[in-house]
Amino acid sequence: MTTQVSFATRVGRSVLAALGAVSLSAAVLTAPAHAADTGLFGTQDATYDGVYRQSLAIAGLAATDARIPAAAVDWLADQQCADGSFEAFRSNTSSPCSPSDPENFSGPDTNSTAMAAIALYLAGRTAPARDAIVWLNNVQNDDWGFPFYAGGASDANSTGLSVVAIQTVQPQDKSGRVPNAQAWIGGLKLKCLSGGGLAYQKGGPANGLASSQAYMGLSGALPVDPVDTLSPNPDCKKRNAVSNVGSFLASAITKDGAVQSDFGSGADYSSTGWAVLGLVANGVGKGAVKSGVSTLTRDVESYTYSDGDLVPAAAGLLLMVAAATDEDPRSFGGINLKRALIGSMQ
């Protein structure tokens, strides 16, 4: 039997960073990092997002062809469990990983593992990246979706990130896992008459973060290459998940300049960044991409800094956005994201 949790419960259990909602979680992750964390990006407590933020940071540097410090990659590789998976953070890497526990949100999870696989692969560590993919394949549910923790119910975010990881690390995969997982994502789409978009889990309302990360899962691998000319914002088509979700995200960004938070607290920069990546990957959303990038560059400081400290996951995501949209990562809204990220490393 699988364990199903609501999106709000998942976030409420301190998994904001694993979902990519670093704009919401940064303020509560402010304790000093452990002294042994040589190579870790950022000074915030790594308990809930160490692997995820490190992975986004490395992926962002790779996307912009920046030098990736060996110590940063070593830190991430050392976090890997014996079976190829990753927990959010292991304070003692000499101790075995605990089992994945969806009831208590502990042990290895798919979000950390997927992002770590992507980062390690882009950094040239192909063997551990492929080990991570093997673990992801083994925890895919019978419905073809992916759970946050093994044994849990499938959800849009976890499925989207896992599919991106498989497409990045093993683009030659012929097992059917990717199209079947994408079909599962398509089953979460809402009617075009209501605006489209994806629910976090079947039966729920449209969810901005779930839609943006799962949209990337429908769109391909990381990093996303820029395109010469984007088509206009896509129309919602009831039988086409890609156009449905793309239309939902493009409409949201065009209307408000950003995907709005699912918790009613204004712009969600993380959802907006993921949405921009997905739109560019599909070659659509000219107006939305322009508007989204304008918001991200304008508000870059409030997104990438918390109490004066860099938020590595935010910087990494914006580096990928910069690479996909031909923005200068050395002056993204006036901030040198590469220098800031490297300078935050322990």
Label the model's feature ranges.
Residues 2-346:
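Preference for long, amphipathic alpha-helical scaffolds in soluble/luminal domains
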